[in-house]
Amino acid sequence: EEAGWVQVATSQEIGIQTGSYFLSTDKYISENTDTLAKFLQAVDESTQYINDHLDESAEYLADKLGLKAEDFKENWKNYSFEPGFSEEATTHLEDIEKWGFEHGSFPKDYNVRDFINTDVAKIAFPDNVTIE
């Protein structure tokens, strides 16, 4: 707003939710499976801590990162960490790949499922891996 921007709507208001995925090579996964599982568990624990202590976390991060605490809290409402790997997430990636191929972002069409490795997620959150 200070630069002249005016917020028209939030991502929540228009139903946009972004997803993110952790990427690695098969070699790194096979050599560091337990460490990566602990990493996923730590991300989940950190997310829960922030959810349970949002005001305190926002103030801390505002101080450390130069953010406004209220901006962090507003953005955090759009964040969710769902550990594991769901069929829904797989379908989302397939939709992205299809769109990318159809719009010339990818030189060839490929099967997303050939690149998904759930070994780590099955260790860290076995009940949350629902990819078929």
Labelled PLM ranges:
Residues G19-D34:
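A bilobed periplasmic-binding-protein/Venus flytrap-type ligand-binding module shared by bacterial periplasmic
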Residues Q17-T18, Y79-S80, I116-V120:
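Short secondary-structure boundary/hinge segments and terminal tails
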Residues F101-E132:
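Conserved C-terminal helix/tail region of periplasmic/extracytoplasmic solute-binding proteins
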Residues S30-P107:
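Secondary-structure end/capping motifs
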Residues G4-V6, S24, I123-P126:
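Short low-complexity, flexible loop/linker segments enriched in glycine and/or proline
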